[in-house]
């Protein structure tokens, strides 16, 4: 299997970006909802730091994925797709990427505006002044962007199932 995409399927690197992101998000989203229910404590702060580190990892995987996509064309879609399907797929992908970036950035800004430090590997980052109004606003953005991401992932999976079962095209095989 080639590292680069071909006309028939995605290359190994694109597949790894896709499936690693999927697996991490399947764990990260419920983890985030679990954190919401925890009382404030040292344990919660430790778990939030893990959550943030995972989120930053997804951010960078997505960034590298987009850079790779820019320099490496996607497989052809074939003649069975009409323009509306292609437009919907492109919009879904665009908003998937946008929601991932929005979730990460808003989560980090929420934490920093709460006056907390962001522990990233061996460094601590923070703002000199807290702003609880902005922290609440970024928290709301973080939550709603997660709901958007969940919806988009569900639509993405549904579209793949429909294509695989009803249209019997090879769209799923391209990414496996």
Spans of features found by a protein language model:
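Membrane-embedded alpha-helical bundles that constitute the cytochrome b-like, heme-associated redox core
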Residues: 1-176
């Amino acid at each position: 299997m080639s590292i680069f995409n071909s006309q028939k399927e995605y290359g190994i690197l694109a597949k790894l970006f896709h499936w690693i992101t999927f697996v991490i998000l399947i764990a990260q989203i419920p983890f985030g909802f679990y954190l919401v229910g925890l009382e404030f404590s040292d344990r919660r702060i430790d778990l939030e730091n893990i959550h943030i580190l995972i989120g930053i990892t997804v951010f960078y995987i997505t960034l590298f994925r987009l850079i790779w996509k820019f320099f490496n064309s996607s497989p052809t879609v074939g003649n069975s797709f009409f323009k509306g399907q292609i437009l919907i797929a492109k919009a879904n992908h665009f908003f998937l990427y946008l929601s991932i970036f929005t979730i990460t950035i808003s989560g980090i800004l929420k934490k920093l505006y709460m006056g907390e430090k962001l522990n990233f590997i061996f460094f601590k980052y923070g703002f000199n002044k807290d702003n609880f109004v902005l922290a609440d606003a970024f928290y709301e953005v973080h939550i709603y962007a997660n709901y958007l991401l969940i919806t988009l992932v569900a639509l993405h999976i549904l579209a793949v199932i429909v294509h695989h079962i009803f249209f019997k095209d090879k769209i799923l095989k391209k990414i496996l």
